[in-house]
Amino acid sequence: MNRESENRRRNQRNVQRTNAVMGACAVALLAAQAASPAHAGAYEQARRIYERLDGVQPSATVLNTMANDILSQPGQAGLLAAAVVATDPHTGANFYDATLKEFINPWTNRNQSAFVPFNDYTATVIGMIRDDIPFNTVLSANILYTVNAPGLPAASPANNDHYATAEANGVDFATALQQTTQTVAYGTPSQGVAGVWTTHTGAAAYFVLGTNRAQFRFTMLNYLCHDMQLVMDNTRPTDRIRQDVARSPGGDSRVFLDNCAGCHSGMDPMAQAFAYYDFNSTTNEMVYTPGQVVPKYVKNPQNFPWGFVTPNDDWANRWRTGPNADLGWDQSLPGSGEGAASLGQELENTTAFANCQVVKVFQTVCMRTPTSSADQATVASIQALFTQSNYDLKQVFQQSAAACAGT
């Protein structure tokens, strides 16, 4: 009996050893078949493109599709075709559900946190990118994206419950977002709508309390990649700086002339575009009062009674001349206007706006700042294509992923 058991165990070990050898040979054979430099390189590039855009590994089917695109279309064309697959709502849902959400969320709050509940601002930008809406309308268009899914409260100008519930329910935002307008969904008069500025989230973050200068400052930071210290210009006239800015802080007028005036002389004439906006913390809604300047624009008049008293929402861009002309203002626009939407058009059509979007995307996808001469040349090329292709930001993600597929 013992001898029979030993023979049985020996036979089992031999079978297992044989199977292991055969399995190893099969794997080696498959590896040899797939390991030609072009084949292996295509699969590695496809995997890298997908992981950079979606943050997860692709399925075998999607990976094969992307690799075949790369193999069948040598050069940049194949890499771009693969990136298109990775950003398709049906094969690259995580691009919308995770990558874009984390990319956009910091713009929606003063703490610049990516970890905030899903909201109307983020949803609208994701929808614009998915649907190839020209991104140089993000600060001016009458647009809003809501979620088309069962069991959700209606979109409301007073909260983000509609969006937070959708996120909690695991809704696929890649396919569930639907376009509407803020006028239809929130009842905001069309003349008072200005892209993401007037979403519930945009208003709650940047029109609440204060003087509405925060909306301008964070727009410069998030959309032109310039914080205020980078655009200080003490050569601009000071005649439209409001009363609340002391001209001799601490009894020293040099502080105003050397510091305060450099920002306020350009910012205050443009932030006048927001003169009819406030945020009511009791009702939790944006307030828009066409024709009536909100009280925050005339607060603390005792600081300098001879300062500018805001009469309306007419704005003017004093930075079109001087050092801030380098921001690249669109000469086809007048440089002045009435209300927030026209100011949005002024800002979103600058060279700085286009460059900012491309640099942010490049940093996100390529995981590095474009400081080398090669990276700067890549950014310049993508930026040119961005403006020439109707400001399609999804293409910027695709082009950045293709450019960094080998690094």
Question: What is each of the regions a protein language model found here?
Answer:
Residues 1-17:
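N-terminal secretory signal peptides that target proteins for export/translocation
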Residues 22-32:
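Bacterial N-terminal signal peptides
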Residues 34-42:
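Boundary at the C-terminal end of the N-terminal hydrophobic targeting segment
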Residues 42-93, 97-100, 277-329, 336, ...:
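Substrate/cofactor-recognition hotspot
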Residues 79-270, 348, 352, 362-365, ...:
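Extended surface/linker regions that mediate inter-domain or inter-protein docking
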Residues 202-212, 246-255, 265, 280-370, ...:
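Electron-transfer interface patches adjacent to heme c in soluble/periplasmic c-type cytochromes
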Residues 272-275:
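Histidine-centered nuclease catalytic patch
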